[in-house]
């Protein structure tokens, strides 16, 4: 039974549950996106992921790549900007694109409220 002091707790995020469910969901989304475009994880030079949780991003990248990602393959801006919601992946892209060269492929992926997720495959032009 809810009491008056609990009014601010009508909506509670179940962080561990979200983590367990979002990691495979996003990894599968990226893998499907790559497959739909006849690409493999090995084709990716970089993954700019939603900047909410470093551990979550590390596991997503590991599932997609089949190994631990390097810091250049999956950069983070969490230490500098914290969680900026859906803007995080674009901020990471902006801050970590200078050594992304012509012809290289990457994926930008954001995910969040309501288990929404989206990705875009990018190829650096000449």
Language-model features: where?
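A generic structural signal for well-ordered alpha-helical surface patches
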Residues: 58, 62, 79, 87, ...
């Amino acid at each position: 039974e809810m009491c008056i002091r609990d009014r601010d707790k009508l909506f509670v995020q179940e962080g561990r549950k979200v983590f367990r469910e979002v990691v495979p969901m996003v990894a599968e989304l990226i893998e499907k996106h790559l497959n739909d475009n006849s690409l493999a994880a090995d084709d990716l030079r970089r993954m700019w992921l939603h900047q909410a949780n470093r551990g979550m991003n590390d596991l997503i990248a590991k599932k997609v790549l089949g190994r631990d990602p390097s810091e250049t393959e999956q950069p983070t801006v969490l230490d500098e900007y914290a969680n900026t919601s859906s803007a995080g992946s674009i901020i990471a892209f902006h801050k970590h694109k200078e050594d992304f060269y012509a012809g290289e492929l990457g994926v930008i992926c954001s995910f969040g409220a309501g288990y929404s997720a989206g990705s875009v495959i990018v190829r650096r032009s000449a």
